[in-house]
Amino acid sequence: MRLPLSLAAAGILLAIPAQAHVTLDPASAPAGSFVRAALRVPHGCNGAATTRIAVEIPEGIYTAKPMPKPGWRLTIERRPPQAAHAAHAAHGHHEEEEVARIIWEGGRLPDDQYDEFVLMLQVPNEPGGTLFLPVTQGCEGGRSDAWAERPAPGQQAHDLAHPAPAMRLNPR
């Protein structure tokens, strides 16, 4: 009797799809460094193809540049610089505005395929901290998923339904 019950339980577990989230690669980087970061998109929205990825760039990130993606239209939205930007500009950086959001849209990533959306950025010089890059994933039919939740102290990101892609900042 135990064997059929175990097999039935295993069958139920196999029928439940694994929940995959938009993630950031690498998962960690030296604080203050320049990083090639890839937003990994493992699926669409309940079977619908992904047609838009928008990533929010936190204030204080002075360098953020997207990699163009063939077949996708690229938009860079900007915001006025923070006061801290003046000190950053004194070190040879001449951007007049900070990048606020990077959007790839107009392409089509089927639900059963995987892809990466790449950007280069200088991560904050905050050893021991975590950089969160909230992402909104738009799909055919108007559905969207906001991957923007941050874990509370003591909580793990994998416990959240829609965790924001994150990168740990290590000492140099």
For the regions a language model picked out, list residue spans one by one.
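Low-complexity, intrinsically disordered segments enriched in Ser/Thr together with acidic residues
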Residues: I102-G129
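N-terminal edge beta-strand
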Residues: Q19-V41
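N-terminal signal peptide c-region/cleavage motif recognized by signal peptidases
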Residues: A15-P17
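Low-complexity, serine/threonine/proline/glycine-rich extracellular segments that form mucin-like
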Residues: F34-P70
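A surface/secretory-pathway sequence property marking extracellular, secreted
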Residues: I61-E98, P165-P171
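Bacterial N-terminal signal peptides that target proteins for export
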Residues: M1-L7
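Short, surface-exposed ligand- or partner-binding patches at beta-edge/loop junctions that are enriched
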Residues: P127-Q137
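Extracytoplasmic/periplasmic copper-protein system
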Residues: A31, G138-R172
